Amino acid sequence: MEFHYVAQADLELLTSSNPPASASQSTGITGGSHRARPGPVHFIDKVTDKPSHSHPFALKENWNLNPEPSSPPSPLFLEAPSRQASQHHGASPGAGTSAGCPFEKCCSTEPCLSGLGDVGRGEAASLRARPGSGASRGQGPGSRVSCRRDLGKPLHAPAGFSAGEVHTTPLGNLGA
C-alpha cells in the first residue's frame, strides 16, 4: 500500500535588472531575458510501508525560465522518499473524488485535473490510489503515481506524464 504526499510551493528566481556585462553580451549575443520566474513547483513525497531503494531526490522536468507571458508556466515535479513513513493520511476510497480518478482529495468534478488547487494553497493532502483504478497497475517498490492540473492548454510534460492523465512509471524509466 502506498500513499503520496503532495505539496506545492511557488519559487521565484531573483535576478538583477541591470546585470554586468557577460561573455555573451561582449560577443554580440542578445535577446535573453534577465527576469525569470519559473512556474509552480509540485513536490511529491512518496510514503510507503515497503522499503524504497530509489534515489533520494529525482528531478522530473526541466525548468522553463522564460515562459511566454500569455501562457501558464510549466510545473516542475520533484519526488523524494518519505521522511516520516509512519504518517499515513487518507480518506476512505471514493470520498471527494470523481469517477475514474485514483486519488483522494486530489480531484473534484473534473477527473484528475482540478484537485491540485487544494494542495496549491499550502495545504498538505495525502493521496491514495483506489484498488481497481488504472493507477494501481505497476504500483509497488520503485513506482510512483501523480496527477497534474490542466491549466487550459498543453504543458511540457515530464517523462511518463501527459496533461490531464494519470500514469505510473517505474523509476528505471524516468530518464526515457
UniProtKB/Swiss-Prot annotation:
Name of the protein: Uncharacterized protein ARRDC1-AS1
Highest taxon listed in the record's lineage: Eukaryota
Polar residues compositional bias, start-end: 15-28
Gene name as annotated: ARRDC1-AS1
Disordered, as annotated region: 15-100, 125-176
Biased composition (Basic and acidic residues): 43-52
Classification of source organism: Eukaryota, Metazoa, Chordata, Craniata, Vertebrata
